[in-house]
Amino acid sequence: MTEKERNKTEPREHKVTNPYSGQSEMLTATEYAYYFLIKYAERTGDYNAMQKGLSKFSSLNAKAYMTLLD
């Protein structure tokens, strides 16, 4: 089972809100981990890690990517 397939069966337990728009999305544990990695990489200036995280997150949940990170 691929990560994308496994992600479809995970419960959406983590509510994340875009601080600029106020819109929220419910994320799986996997998506939440990528979101946290992206925001941490952004704060620390690790743009290579941030870009990899953005790519992976957007492939797992395009709607949440557009709401939270785009």
Question: Predicted segments — roles?
Answer:
Residues 20, 50-53:
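Preference for short coil/turn "hinge" residues that link or interrupt alpha-helices
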Residues 10, 49-50:
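Generic detector of short alpha-helix boundary/capping microenvironments
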Residues 1-41:
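N-terminal acidic leader/helix
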Residues 52-70:
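Short, compact, well-ordered microdomains
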Residues 42-48:
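Charged, low-complexity interaction regions
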Residues 4-6, 17, 45, 60, ...:
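Intrinsic-disorder/low-complexity regions
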